[in-house]
UniProtKB/Swiss-Prot annotation:
PANTHER family: COLOSTRUM TRYPSIN INHIBITOR (PTHR10083:SF380), KUNITZ-TYPE PROTEASE INHIBITOR-RELATED (PTHR10083). GO terms for biological process: lactation. Glycans are attached at residues 14, 31, 42. SMART domains: KU. Residues 23-73 form the BPTI/Kunitz inhibitor domain. Disulfide bonds join 23-73, 32-56, 48-69. The lineage of its organism: Eukaryota, Metazoa, Chordata, Craniata, Vertebrata. The record marks 33-34 as: Reactive bond. Keywords: Disulfide bond, Glycoprotein, Lactation, Milk protein, Protease inhibitor, Secreted, Serine protease inhibitor. The keyword Transmembrane does not apply. GO terms for cellular component: extracellular space. This is Early lactation protein. GO terms for molecular function: serine-type endopeptidase inhibitor activity. It comes from Notamacropus eugenii (Tammar wallaby).
Length: 83
């Protein structure tokens, strides 16, 4: 059990080296009344997924398009594969 905890911690630490810190944030809907389909980077699935954004507040893991989300949060993927 201790080994599993250590693996999870090491995995998160390594992920933070590969992914910009804003992409590690959980999706936050915000507290306004709009319902806008936005994207956030999911560190578990390592892809961008949709969520409903209220139009205000929230955090920086919030993108208008899947393309921009992937471009921002997976930008180091090819660079790391070449090393």
């Amino acid at each position: 059990e201790k080994c599993l905890d250590q693996i999870q911690v090491n995995s998160l630490e390594n992920l933070s080296l590969l992914v910009p810190s804003l992409c590690l944030l959980p999706p936050v809907r915000g507290n306004c009344s709009s319902q806008i389909l936005h994207y956030f980077y999911n560190t578990t699935s390592r892809t961008c997924e949709t969520f409903i954004y209220s139009g205000c507040n929230g955090n920086r893991n919030n993108f208008n398009s899947e393309e921009y989300c992937l471009k921002t949060c997976r930008r180091n993927k090819n660079r790391n594969n070449n090393n």
